Amino acid sequence: MFRTPQARLPARPCGGRRGILAAGLAVLLSACSGTLSSSDMFGTSSVAPAGAEQAAQSAIGTGQTKVGLLLPLSAPGNAGLAGQAMRNAAELAFAEFNNANIQLLVKDDGGTAQGAQQAAQQAIDEGAEIILGPLFAQSVTAAAQAARARGVPVIAFSTDSNVAGRGIFLLSFLPESDVDRIVGYAIAQGRRSFVGFVPDSPYGSVVEAEFKQVVARKGGRVVAVERYAADGSKMTEPARLVAEAAARADVLFIPDSGDGAVAAAKALGAAGLDAKRLQVIGTGQWDDPRVFAEPALEGGWYPAPDSGGFRAFSARYRTRYGQDPVRTATLAYDAVALVAALAKTQGDKRFSPETLTNPSGFAGIDGVFRFRADGTNQRGLAVLKATPSGGQMVAPAPRSFGGSGT
């Protein structure tokens, strides 16, 4: 199913139309060949966007299938940096795909909802059959209004699953996938009782809801969940309650990043909880040097994509553009590789719901992924262990999906 970057012809069919689709696209998308956190989604590059105005008015390629690409090219700060890096990644994907029969209509949405709606409308008026982007949740909602009115699907990059829906698919790293993977792994290792210490934030609300659902679905039980102020204040009382409940649990869930996870661990320690007695787990936000340096979190498990694909992509990006890509750049690369593969192999059904929600999924830079009918996605993630020297692999990312994608 997976081939080297040079192998770009469809693989041997594995049975049925969807089997052929899965096999062929896995090879096509492997032409490139980890987890985004809310705190680092735009990376740390200090290089300003180059030629944003010119890029906003340009097209990439001259193929028959037109594809809208909406990015915050002229947005201030890190958003603009991300937009330019994602445009570069889209260009790189096009260049590396063998005879891509697509034309990318690059539109600058300015990082605003109004800009996104206008950009989507313009791309559709110019013949776009599918929209890639935007990046921000409010922009996705606005672009979706224009796209739905014309029956044009959207593959967006927001991490807010609330904006997904009929015809609006999210390619981003969603916290729900993180929770599903890490809880599932813990239960597979014989853990059954969970206690959660969760930041009181929109992100915390999402992961808490998913945490409770996944634990119940997989046959475990949640002993208690306590919330703490996202700014790290007033942790004493909720930490005390978690420490008491932890006596009846064998897993401690701390879904926070960097300083937040460290502060939570210290507060629990001050409340008398011995984290070494439990298996501590987190989300992809743990992929952070501050987490690795915290003794109370050492040995904790967290999910992340296999880093090999991103390292290889970064090297090629650096060679072409002279700087490191932001982490979101892989989303644009995979989106372009996906639509190029679909345009090449799927004829008139290239962007149909059936094609996009193929349960066998697709292979990209960061591993396998598939879209669900509700517009969210599932990703094949590895499980890593936090150590002072960084994340250490304890379970590899799956290379294929089993079961339906619903």
Give residue spans per PLM region.
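C-terminal motif of bacterial Sec signal peptides marking the signal peptidase cleavage site
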Residues: 28-31
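Extracytoplasmic "Venus flytrap"
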Residues: 48-88, 107, 113, 328
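Extracellular/periplasmic periplasmic-binding protein-like sensory domains
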Residues: 261-333, 346-347, 397, 401-404
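An alpha-beta-alpha
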Residues: 170-227
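Beta-alpha junction/loop-to-helix N-cap segments that form part of ligand/metal-binding clefts
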Residues: 84-85, 96-162, 172
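Bacterial signal peptide processing site
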Residues: 33-36
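Periplasmic-binding protein-like
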Residues: 123-135, 154-157, 193-198, 246-261, ...
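Segments of small-molecule ligand-sensing domains
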Residues: 321-395, 404-406
